[in-house]
């Protein structure tokens, strides 16, 4: 069942969780040679006002904690997978803007790259990704 962007944030906000991690796979059909992993955290932009997260959307502490979480997970992913490091980036994605706890969005590879897609569809690489995400989260909390 598809869960809408605002509903994802609402569920995260109501869950009592300490962090929010949104897992995705990227695509760039115009350039099938692009590969790598990138991690996003929220960047305030007044052109994107909050819808459900008015109190925390521009909270400096939440944004700093999100940046720390993004760095910890990105570092672990690159170290454990050997993937191209496309960096920690900032964006106004709805799930980052509307979530009231430290939040990151992971792009774990490019499905438009035949080479990367072949890796992404194997159970062993999926396990490697899951373990790397877990290690990054553990490092964030230490």
Question: Which residues does each PLM region occupy?
Answer:
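Active-site-proximal helix/loop segments of hydrolytic enzymes
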Residues: 1-142
